């Protein structure tokens, strides 16, 4: 790869552990140790890459915060219009909200993902964002 991707926080390694929940290639660069503090990681998506619909469950607190640091991407909550994301945008995702996020078709995209502490937190991975939906953005 000749171009630098991942913004100031670096590309990281191929996100192989979660590849089955993504269309396209993504990369993960952990920024904190979740044993010591809240978990934060820089997640980078190649053009056209997006994760499946998913839900960050919690009985209290929880959810996720995305801080956009490089490129352009998309965020969408189930049943709502998609939101185009740019460097500097921040997305606060409440617990128990079905959503997806990823790169635009023609841009790499990186965001810092912050796991918001909560009680009884789990992640539920759902269906992929189909090509027809994505290509019509």
For each feature predicted by the language model, list its residue ranges.
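Conserved hydrophobic/aromatic beta-strand scaffold that supports enzyme active sites
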Residues: 28-30, 40-44, 65, 82, ...
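Conserved metal-binding segment of the jelly-roll/cupin
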Residues: 48, 85-106
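Conserved short histidine dyad/triad with adjacent acidic residue
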Residues: 41-60
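Short histidine-centered beta-strand/loop micro-motifs
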Residues: 30-32, 52-58, 77, 83-84, ...
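A short beta-strand-loop-beta hairpin characteristic of the jelly-roll/cupin
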Residues: 50, 60-87, 97
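A short, compositionally biased micro-patch
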Residues: 34, 46-48, 68, 78, ...
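A short hydrophobic beta-strand segment most commonly corresponding to one strand
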Residues: 92, 106-125
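A short, N-terminal "cap"/entry segment at the start of jelly-roll beta-barrel domains
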Residues: 1-39, 122-137
